[in-house]
Amino acid sequence: MKNKNKRLLVMAGGTGGHVFPGLAVAKQLQSEGWEIRWLGTADRMEADLVPKHGIEIDFIKVKGLRGQGLKKLIAAPFQILGAISQAKKHIKAWQPDVVLGMGGYVSGPGGIAAWLSGIPVVLHEQNAVAGLTNQWLSKIAKRVFQAFPGAFPNAEVVGNPVREDVCQLPHPKERFAQRTGPIRLLVMGGSQGARILNTTLPEALPQLSHEIEIWHQAGKGSQETVEQAYRDNGIADAKVTEFIDNVAEAYAWADLLVCRSGALTVSEVSAAGVGSIFIPFMHKDRQQALNADHLVQCGAAQMIEQQDLTVQGLVDTLNGLERKQLLDMACNARDAAIIDADVRVANAIKSLAK
């Protein structure tokens, strides 16, 4: 007898940019009585993260093809066929009503397996440039969503699903109302940190013409090095952490953010309402630069391409930002936010469930 509750299988893995938006959609549907299961790989972050959110996960064996040697490329078709077969077994055993692909290597075999099994596939592309897996799957998906314009020519722009505590932060006008004293600068390079931020910021910040308070996420294994870099440049009170567990608290604290422009970061700072200086990672397809572009265009952020980043240039940029301008940037960021992406994607999934 078929289970009375609707079931969603989420395919996402590899990075937080794929996994966290998938979790946001999953939680939305769980609140409406849906059962959720996950398809991932055993050696990536989803293996630990997803079960912590109370969601069972199945694994398939699959790796990316970029940068592989000739022998591995020759073997790749057999690996992909094996991964599709594994995914089909998991799908047959659990019988989801809909499959949601959020990106990562696992989505390719999982999406094909769902299509072969007659299960409708919904895709969400987090970046302004579509990943290779989603480019392929878009041809067989029932619905395709994109966070930013341009990833697909005809897909609906819904933003990225962002964690609820970020979306619920008070408006920038309320947060900034009583702030005086040093400008609060939050530096984030992602969970792995960003070497160029870890080296440039400690050198640039002592040269500013105004006081500043610093919270710097250095990334795994870099905390002591970055702390020492600040001390070497005369700043003894910088708060340096490997990770920021409560990112909503950090956004609420900050007057300005200096960071990479990964898709989820761009969506989060917009939802939070924080002005930003983006230093995009140098992808050959300029993915991160294109992610940030819409916030730059609406006056919510400035962007310095990594190849153009210098200590003096960063000093000049930061010196040019006063509290009034920071508030304007924060308000523009909030105005540009799409904070119901999880609901929009969830509604599409519900419409496809038989």
Swiss-Prot record:
Binding residues for UDP-N-acetyl-alpha-D-glucosamine: T15, G16, G17, N127, R163, S191, I244, A263, L264, T265, V266, S267, E268, Q288
SUPFAM superfamilies registered for this protein in UniProt: UDP-Glycosyltransferase/glycogen phosphorylase
Pathway: Cell wall biogenesis; peptidoglycan biosynthesis
Single GO biological process annotation from the record: lipid glycosylation
Top class in the EC scheme: transferase
Principal location class: membrane
Reactions it catalyzes: di-trans,octa-cis-undecaprenyl diphospho-N-acetyl-alpha-D-muramoyl-L-alanyl-D-glutamyl-meso-2,6-diaminopimeloyl-D-alanyl-D-alanine + UDP-N-acetyl-alpha-D-glucosamine = di-trans,octa-cis-undecaprenyl diphospho-[N-acetyl-alpha-D-glucosaminyl-(1->4)]-N-acetyl-alpha-D-muramoyl-L-alanyl-D-glutamyl-meso-2,6-diaminopimeloyl-D-alanyl-D-alanine + UDP + H(+)
Record GO cellular component, one term: plasma membrane
Membrane topology: Peripheral membrane protein
Record flagged with keyword Transit peptide: no
Assigned protein family: Belongs to the glycosyltransferase 28 family. MurG subfamily.
NCBIfam families: murG (TIGR01133)
Name this protein carries in UniProt: UDP-N-acetylglucosamine--N-acetylmuramyl-(pentapeptide) pyrophosphoryl-undecaprenol N-acetylglucosamine transferase
Organism taxonomic ancestry: Bacteria, Pseudomonadati, Pseudomonadota, Gammaproteobacteria, Vibrionales
Gene for this chain: murG
